[in-house]
């Protein structure tokens, strides 16, 4: 059996955020075409302070061939079965085992506890390697999980919990970026909530027969992108920037019909010979796209310094950084190129710029 999985929709009202309802509607419509009859929503279906779920009920009633299984998340802890009227909605506000071709354990978000503590209360009914965990919170592997801008740790699942209780797979909400780490899968948000959630959005399809995970695109009303350019002074700074801009736009891999949905934030930082020319080129090159909150390209962190000798040194330093041998240093512990170059330029130019 194939089951669709999403999370972190953060519905408000159709009036305030129609794009979020449209994204969920697109998922439900896609399931009919794919022949999938179950959708799991792993928490934060609703945004905080939303207590009337009637518009969601109406949407589900329009797609009554799909059974929707959902748990509360940290933003919608009041989700419970009695709040829904649609016949095809199942809300689990306490740990619940559900047979969907195999055993799924739905663990609703609970403040002040861990997923492992909840799993421990159900372990006698869970056959190792034969059950799937659905939860909402942080998967803790000794480092902070990227993709959440919320402080603290929310209902953590530890690697030791997986080793101890042996779920076959884990499907989690809370992190808005799609990611996979071993058997732990985050679908990510199906519609970007703000400029920090960039690119195309997807939902997951989980195959209960073989644990295969695949992604399926969501046709969203908006597509957020952020582009940041590290500028190093030189006679070729404009030609380099133009080439870099073209490559960035190409990397979005959007077709013509999607370009009008882009909401973009652009910034340039570092040092240059001609700040106005950089600003003009950014504005011209991205002129066909709508900018987030109608903001112009941000060049406030771009300084001018025409010292050719320092520019030559900066170019050489960049080459060394690009060829740096990190050895056995884990990827997640490595500083990014721009982060290193920012520090290097401050040393080279000593803050000397205008």
Task: Show which residues each predicted segment covers.
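A structural signal for the main folded, soluble domain(s) of proteins
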Residues: 1, 25-33, 120-123, 142, ...
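N-terminal active-site segment of His-dependent metallophosphoesterases
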Residues: 1-58, 127-129, 334-354
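Accessory, non-catalytic peripheral segments of nucleic-acid enzymes
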Residues: 210-354
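A short, well-ordered alpha-helical element
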Residues: 23-35, 119-124, 238-255
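A conserved active-site cap/scaffold subdomain adjacent to cofactor or substrate pockets
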Residues: 173-241
């Amino acid at each position: 059996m194939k089951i669709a999985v999403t999370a972190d929709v953060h519905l408000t009202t159709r009036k305030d955020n129609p794009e979020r309802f449209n994204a969920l509607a697109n998922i439900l419509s896609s399931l009919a075409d794919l022949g999938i009859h179950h959708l799991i929503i792993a928490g934060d279906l609703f945004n905080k302070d939303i207590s009337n779920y009637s518009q969601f009920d109406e949407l589900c009633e329009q797609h009554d061939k799909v059974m929707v299984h959902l748990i509360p998340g940290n933003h919608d802890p009041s989700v419970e079965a009695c709040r829904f009227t649609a016949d095809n909605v199942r809300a689990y506000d306490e740990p619940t085992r559900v047979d969907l071709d195999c055993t799924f354990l739905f663990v609703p978000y609970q403040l002040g506890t861990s997923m492992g503590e909840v799993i421990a209360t159900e372990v006698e009914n869970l056959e190792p390697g034969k059950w799937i965990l659905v939860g909402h919170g942080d998967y803790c592997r000794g480092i902070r999980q990227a993709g959440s801008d919320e402080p603290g740790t929310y209902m953590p699942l530890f690697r030791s919990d997986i080793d101890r209780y042996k779920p076959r797979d884990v499907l989690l909400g809370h992190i808005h970026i799609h990611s996979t780490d071993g058997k732990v899968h985050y679908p990510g948000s199906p519609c970007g909530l703000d400029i920090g959630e960039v690119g195309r959005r997807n939902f997951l399809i989980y195959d209960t027969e073989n644990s295969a995970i695949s992604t399926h695109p969501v046709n969203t009303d908006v597509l957020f992108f952020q582009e940041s350019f590290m500028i190093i002074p030189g006679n070729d700074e404009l030609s380099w920037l133009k080439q870099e801009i073209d490559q960035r736009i190409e990397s979005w891999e959007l077709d013509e019909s999607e370009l009008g949905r882009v909401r973009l934030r652009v910034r340039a930082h570092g040092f240059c010979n001609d700040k106005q020319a950089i600003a003009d080129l950014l504005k011209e090159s991205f002129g066909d796209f709508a900018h987030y909150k109608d903001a112009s390209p941000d060049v406030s962190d771009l300084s001018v310094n025409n010292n050719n000798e320092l520019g030559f040194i900066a170019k050489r330093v960049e080459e060394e950084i690009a060829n740096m041998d990190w050895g056995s240093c884990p990827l997640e512990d490595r500083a990014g190129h721009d982060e290193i170059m920012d520090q290097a330029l401050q040393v080279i130019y000593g803050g000397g710029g205008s």
